[in-house]
Amino acid sequence: MKVLAAMSGGVDSSVAAARMVDAGHDVVGVHLALSTVSGTLRTGSRGCCSKEDVSDARRVADVLGIPFYVWDFAEKFQEDVIDNFVSAYARGETPNPCVQCNQRIKFSALSVRALMLGFDTVATGHYARLSGGRLRRAVDRGKDQSYVLAVLTAQQLRHAAFPIGDTLKRQVRAEAARRGLLVADKPDSHGICFIPSGNTRAFLSECIGIRRGSVVDADGTVLAEHDGVHGFTVGQRKGLGIVGPGPNGRPRYVTAIDADTATVYVGDAADLGVHTLIGRAPVFTAGAAPLGPVQCVVQIRAHGETAVAVVELIGDELFVRLCEPLRGVARGQTLVLYRLDPDGDEVLGSATIASMSA
């Protein structure tokens, strides 16, 4: 089988590529240049597409004895991931850029090019498993990335491989060391790759500019002014610009955002719970949509809590009724569905949260 191994320069993708070589496949390594800034440098465990990352990926490819190329996807990454990220925050939403990158870049643009060039599969270092064409959680639950892959279609998954999904992270590092790969102890990447400073609010402010509005409570009392709704997300407690707690002595949280009026609403923690969600643009990883209401497990953050819910597809929207409330649910988040069984590791599908109610 002809395999294109996506190599970021990190330990996970390096071991994934090595395993595909060991399996006897015809492997070619490729590094995706996603930054429009020439010579971008890594800042500790933050940043992406740095000169160090390219060099590390190339050295691993040399050790493995496979061809290696750098493909420039910077313009498409800017349009499909960064610009969408900024636009979503300007609308008062809370998107996950890793979800968008997987859906639009790694398993769309990259996969399409790979198939056009005659490759059968794109292998990545994601912590997830494929079994019988079904996407499942990784063995290492602490590193599981099935959440950010749940937007992939059955067709996309047919041409994907996740060689390290059955392995614990510490075992991956140990294997890299045994293979003599210099990335064995390289720090994991954290945060949003295109915001190496880690300051999302500053990044968004630079992109969007100042759009002043008010922070108000449930009674409509103005508590503070702000420079843009992009600096807030539902569930946020710090950085609200409010002095002191609420009149009941309890902390205040962002409970809702109205981008049209530039209003940020705050309230008690009790105001954060929601029981009903509506998701748009649903994707079902196994291909077929569920027939009628189905009980499953839902998750709204990459490593967040889960909850049992009854889900039903009505038209082109996903209606979700939670058995227990979830807190801090925001528009724009990815809602992922898992099969309700003892393992709870099979992904059924996903949608983008369009609205929610208590």
Swiss-Prot record:
SUPFAM superfamilies: Adenine nucleotide alpha hydrolases-like. Its EC number is 2.8.1.13. ATP binds at residues 6-13, 32, 125. Gene3D superfamilies: Adenine nucleotide alpha hydrolases-like domains (2.30.30.280), HUPs (3.40.50.620), Translation factors (2.40.30.10). Keywords: ATP-binding, Cytoplasm, Disulfide bond, Nucleotide-binding, RNA-binding, Transferase, tRNA processing, tRNA-binding. Residues 143-145 are annotated as: Interaction with tRNA. NCBIfam families: PRK00143.1, trmU. Catalyzes the 2-thiolation of uridine at the wobble position (U34) of tRNA, leading to the formation of s(2)U34. This is tRNA-specific 2-thiouridylase MnmA. It comes from Mycobacterium leprae (strain TN). The gene is mnmA.
